[in-house]
């Protein structure tokens, strides 16, 4: 096997990278000190810098995959290796080049997430000891690493553990941090003024600003309150500081601009959280106002302007400070000097629209540039509306009307005035908004519907080429933004017009048309979709053809997948068409398989990929309802593509393919499993496949489906034992134990007792061991459901007798102790209606089985506890209300922006997978229980009624009689 540096060098060559990566994976599996070898390569002076960089990147990814691996994982970093890494990595980082410092600093921050401070108590002292009064490059590395560790506090919820960690840091870090802060401040006043030294100094100041925010983000520490004047005075000086030596390249956001933007974040935090002690608030308001009214429109200032406006917005939203701005003249100046200049189109905006339209869309819709001038200006207007709604609405409306008037005089030349008017109208009209729901509340002083009829609809109905594409894009955006305010007929009438814009040559226009298509199809009035499958049927084929034409016109897999909005529109059409999609089935299969084959070559856009597989899932969902013939058509088209993904080991796609395979297997009814699926069973049992966390949910579902459809295949090929081996691995994991129960449910319902007999004792031994030694609340609840499920079912190895005998095989008589001490007390905690139904039926089966109810039965002492538990399930409130999600609503809300695409599993909403009620025929549980108890009572010669009369309190007896039980 080649050595590691040779393999790393080969990863840099596209023709050899895949084989080199496979060989490195072998090293990972075989060499427990693999991580140390990578670090040694990074440390070796004679190694080529590109190989050292490759080693640092591979090391970073290796640590992220395996640092927190569970016991039993195929790759796990030993405690000894972990300690060596922590001992060496800081010194190695400090002596490395900048680009490698970044990678190692990220690793330190990642390890700190798990080990700091409890298992890495030397980290902070080591970092502090490296701080220098003169070496700014070392300080940059140290402070960058500290920021990587502390910044994770920012989004966290308050907790005792979090505050203990922060206190640990504050007690050790504050004094040296202040000393360095004072030193850099003095150096700035008295030190050298050459560009290189100044730049390094301000890089340190920038990191000091970021760390100041980190250390103050949860609460204001006493130390910083005591030294607030020192810090804030320095920040104020930095905010007004200028020096031509720091200008850098034209158009570049230099470090001084970044420092000022970071200070804006700090003063916004203090305004929002610690305003009562922030005595210099108005000093910062004044310098910020001056800044905003003097900065040029250059792009390099965009981030600073955005954060400066965010700070002013935070001040304005506090009523007592808003009064500072309440004079009409001040409000007028806000709109004219701050808002309007930052909403108006710049030449750079037009260039972005033409030259990088995808980035334009992302900035406009996703907030990828959340500090953009226009976005921040709009938020500022809405902040002013909170307190001065009438005045601001009046002032802005005047500017809207003036811009519309200018546009009307010469639409082809003054089109940018219409653009500004639309931006301003949205700014004052919207009071509440979410990406998923659109506008949820509006300013009642403006008429959204009238504005649509007078200013939007006429543009949309103009012939192609009349309205400028940037205005047309805003017109379309208006429709999907205010989709909940426009009435059903307006949306239905404009829908065909929106679809026509898919044929426009402008990337932004056809993308916004695709977004409108997607979002309009989910609109509900009175909880009912306004666009039914019948209503959209005439538009299905033309829209799909045009969308596929655009997607497939790309020259590379990366370009093909870049516009996820188009694929989301395809997905939405398939979902909403339901069975009406059947005439387009062949077309869809042809295009979806072709696209999957292409993007498999180089998966580059996780969101596009997710919508692609959701589209396939939606197609399977709709077509499988048409019978076995269409399922066969689906299998013939899709299985070869899925096979290719698995053979080529396209890691990103495997969880998706496994879900879709599960859906296909489940849809095939009682048809024999296709050979391809049969041949998949053994690979699915390979332990290596289960090491990837993202595969586990889909693998469990696929195994469940294959066991249900082909139990004899598992029996004849001796696959039952490997399946139980997987169950054992899952059940030992606190993260994945619930998947182990999902698999065990299916094993018990499908395989007969004679098949499972050799394993029953060990299965229950594993469960009881977890309950005794390492139980969690989730495990206990899931184990409770499993016990009741086994008791309630009558197939396979289920049934109350099998449950009791299986548990007692571990230790005689332990079933009764388990029920009274753990299982029965947990039943009332079950929240989902289906779990409670299964539990009630399981309790009923146990109550009426011979091992409990028969004279001199071993567990007759459980009769009253079991019966009491049934009554509590029926009559007492649920401790924590919870319901199964509405699957249709879930599909309406499919949004890849909210999903994670790394090791985690991304569920496909369209593949179903919803739990099925195993007892759909039982609708009135109380009556059913009474009937079964009456039958058992007769069979036992009235024994049950005798025990109830003697031992169950009178109110319990009355409740039972109300169900129909005869005592």
UniProtKB/Swiss-Prot annotation:
One Pfam match: IBN_N
Q: What does this protein do?
A: Export receptor for importin alpha. Mediates importin-alpha re-export from the nucleus to the cytoplasm after import substrates have been released into the nucleoplasm.
SUPFAM superfamilies reported in the protein's UniProt record: ARM repeat
> This protein is called what?
Importin-alpha re-exporter
Q: Which family does it belong to?
A: Belongs to the XPO2/CSE1 family.
- Return one Gene Ontology term, BP aspect: protein import into nucleus
Q: Supply the PANTHER family for this chain.
A: EXPORTIN-2 (PTHR10997:SF8), IMPORTIN-7, 8, 11 (PTHR10997)
| Importin N-terminal domain ranges (all copies) | 20-95
Any idea where this protein resides?
A: Cytoplasm; Nucleus envelope
Q: Which SMART domains match?
A: IBN_N (SM00913)
Task: Report if keyword Secreted is assigned.
Answer: no
- GO: which molecular function terms? GTP binding; nuclear export signal receptor activity; small GTPase binding
Keyword hit for NAD: no
One Gene Ontology term, aspect cellular component? nuclear envelope
Record text on subunit structure and interactions: Binds with high affinity to importin-alpha only in the presence of RanGTP.
**Gene symbol?**
kap109
The organism of origin for this protein: Schizosaccharomyces pombe (strain 972 / ATCC 24843) (Fission yeast)
Keywords carried by this UniProt record: Cytoplasm, Nucleus, Protein transport, Transport
